[in-house]
From Swiss-Prot:
Pathway: Amino-acid biosynthesis; L-histidine biosynthesis; L-histidine from 5-phospho-alpha-D-ribose 1-diphosphate: step 9/9. This is Histidinol dehydrogenase. One of its GO terms (molecular function) is histidinol dehydrogenase activity. The active site is at 326 (proton acceptor), 327 (proton acceptor). Disulfide bonds: none annotated. It comes from the Bacteria. CDD domains: Histidinol_dh. SUPFAM superfamilies: ALDH-like. Zn(2+) binds at residues 259, 262, 360, 419.
Length: 431
């Protein structure tokens, strides 16, 4: 990892230090994704089979996972893995259920009641990536809130393996959350299929899930076309750690590596006011990296990541808010005291004993989070992500008589005579 002193960097160098790797390739992928989406729209399942053969190395007769495949997956996974997923589902359910909105009603004036009612989105599409490793945890993170929201239909796409099967843990995770419509389809082509629909894949109202730069670009393109809404830009994983001199170097290094092993386009950043801590973390990175099964992938990610020395911890928070990380770890002696300084982050992890990996799997919070700086304006997935909040209002005759003049005056100011007349007629006065 590159080690930098923030106080010695120019404005341009500071911008470069916080530039994410994916941002440099977005323009290269945009045209390729647009071509692929157009092909799926035009040729449907035929295009999907050709694209799947090209990218996944398998020709599929059917994209849908059969009951027999679900049963085989159920028999294939280890009992301890099943139990771990069941435990995770319970905690994810507990956390997300506590945050559910029940709507509300308020009388804004005598005889005028305004409400918000909550309705589930009808059909949602979940994407569970498996590019460098299958991610059954993502199926849990998306399936639980979709179930709690009460969505009428939930569709899940995940890439096939070269033998035409799907990772059994992903299928069991889907079953544990009540999802049975699973399709063997990955990448931008899966996003296109769920957005526009084909003979095999139903079109969905909203799409969810993380992915590589191609998946993220595909989600943004289908959203811009109006074909389907999306949860957020959720691209390559990233973590930013703010650590003080009292942090455990081994813990910090382990947290950095846990993100670096996701993929070569992941980014990890460490901000610290301690030279000694930064040096010790670098040593730990070298030691721990040698023990990882995905060391080559992690090494590529580390090559474009940063260890940054800051003058003060306050400076670190200013940098973090500018970067708006997906994951923010506060390896500090009084982490909760610093929490008020956080303005933009997907998920925050407080203290030495809250590794980001807990949030990835089983603490209960959601791990589908905004990346690439989107945490400035987006939140992570929740039950509300799968729901619509519908406004309702009801006015009695006394109610419209009481507030109608306000509407008439505002309508006239905007030159909208019909608006004014619609109110005035009910009041029994001339507009």
């Amino acid at each position: 990892m590159n080690t930098l002193d923030w106080t010695q960097l120019t404005a341009d160098a500071r911008t470069q230090a916080l530039t994410r790797p994916v941002q440099t390739v977005a323009t290269q992928t945009r045209e390729a994704v647009a071509t692929l989406i157009a092909d799926v729209r035009a040729r449907g399942d035929v295009a999907l089979r050709e694209i799947t053969a090209r990218f996944d190395g398998v020709t599929l007769e059917s994209f849908a996972v059969s009951d027999a495949e679900f049963a085989a997956a159920d028999a294939a996974i280890a009992p301890e893995l099943r139990q771990a997923m069941q435990d995770a589902v319970a905690r994810i359910d507990t956390f997300h259920r506590a945050g559910m909105s029940e709507g509300y009603a308020v009388e804004t004036a005598p005889g005028v009641v305004c409400e918000k009612i909550v309705r589930p989105i009808g059909r949602v599409g979940l994407y569970v990536p498996a590019g460098s490793a299958p991610l059954p945890s993502t199926a849990l993170m998306l399936g639980v809130p979709a179930r709690l929201a009460g969505c009428r239909e939930v569709v899940l796409c995940t890439p096939p393996r070269k033998d035409g099967s799907v990772d059994p843990a992903v299928l069991v995770a889907a079953q544990l959350t009540g999802v049975r419509r699973v399709f063997k389809l990955g990448g931008a082509q899966a996003i296109a299929a769920m957005a526009y629909g084909t003979d095999s894949i139903p079109s969905c109202d909203k799409l969810f899930g993380p992915g590589n730069s191609f998946v993220t670009e595909a989600k943004q393109q289908v959203a811009q076309s109006g074909a389907a809404a999306i949860d957020m830009p959720a691209g390559p994983s990233e973590v930013l750690v703010i650590a003080d001199a009292g942090a455990q170097p081994a813990f910090v290094a382990a947290d950095l590596l846990s993100q670096a092993e996701h993929g070569p386009d992941s980014q990890v950043l460490l901000l610290s006011d301690s030279d000694a801590l930064i040096t010790a973390v670098q040593e730990q990175l070298d030691l721990q990296l040698a023990q990882l099964s995905r060391a080559d992938i992690a090494r590529q990610a580390l090559a474009q990541s940063r260890l940054i020395k800051v003058a003060t911890l306050q400076d670190a928070f200013e940098i973090s808010n500018r970067y708006a990380p997906e994951h923010l770890i506060l390896a500090l002696r009084e982490p909760r005291a610093w929490l008020a300084q956080v303005e933009a982050a997907g998920s925050v992890f407080l203290g030495d004993y809250t590794p980001e990996a807990l949030g990835d799997y089983c603490s209960g919070t959601n791990h589908v989070l905004p990346t690439s700086g989107a945490a400035r304006a987006y939140s992570g997935v929740s039950v509300a992500s799968f729901q619509n909040m519908v406004s309702v209002q009801a006015a009695s005759k006394a109610g419209i008589d009481g507030i109608g003049a306000c509407a008439v005056i505002l309508a006239r100011a905007e030159g909208l005579d019909a608006h004014a007349n619609a109110v005035a007629l009910r009041m029994g006065v001339a507009a």
